[in-house]
């Protein structure tokens, strides 16, 4: 196993994947009155791309959740495993936000990831059906902000059976 993992890492380093610019998502809640640091981000991109690793360890989700904190005191993350049919599926979520949280999210950013094989339209409908009783139900201090976002992504790496509707029973069992 050790030799296989070492070989895989070497292959990833020798044949890096190309990341298209339209595959990068930026999210920011910002501080009222402060200009978005576009130049700082633009100048940091080459270093970020050079340091991407394709074989991350289990701590990657903690690192990601910690990386998006602003005034949060702790990283916010969750992980769950379930099945679509007989296929095991993983779902991970990370979020940031500690103040100015009121229904409709305010300064909360949430990112949900799954390895399930689901189309973007299925993901969109799942998120739409669940957002009102989850993220949009959060209240911290009664203040709202103009910056909010929850996104859902599927890598489609799982080999689950095709899902044709977000209402399918096998998604809810």
Which residues fall in each region the model found?
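Glycine-rich, mobile lid/loop segments that gate access to catalytic sites or pores
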Residues: 3-10, 14-135
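A glycine- and small/hydrophobic-rich beta-loop-beta segment
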Residues: 150, 155-173
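Membrane-embedded hairpin module used as a gating/binding unit in multi-pass transport
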Residues: 130-137, 149-157
